[in-house]
Amino acid sequence: MTEKKIVGKLKSFNEVMYKDCFYHALIPTFRHFTGFIEPLLLNDICLEYSIENQDKVPTLIMKNASSQSYSDIFEKFGISVKKSRISSKKMIDHTIEVLNNDGIAIIRIDCFYEPLRIDSYQKYHAGHVIPIYGYDNTRNMFDILEGDFVDSVV
């Protein structure tokens, strides 16, 4: 088994706060494989507006309307995406397999268990998403792209 592997150093996307942590994991991953991010950002530039009556008060509702599915964008640029539900017992082996195949794993975690998140570690549960781009079995560590706080832009 390989002891160390880094698929490539990810460049964080911190120009703006974009949607949520999933996209802040996805955008650097997409940039790693394509060299650019515009297709993802421009895909969501379409907006839908509607007026709804909420408690008898007309309210303007704005929604993003993606012009293409993300699957179509990935396929267009030759990126293969595989969604997996993995038990925590198999998560490490599965992630290492993805990295050994030159992929990047984007996983959901609970910040309560992540020491890097000083604001939430052992304090409260918060769902989060991180990209994993490398590992070092000699130190039992993964290389991840992460911010310092729950609402920080990485």
Language-model features: locations:
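Noncatalytic regulatory segments and standalone regulatory/sensor domains
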Residues: 136-154
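Cysteine-nucleophile protease catalytic domains, especially the papain-like/related folds used
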Residues: 2-88
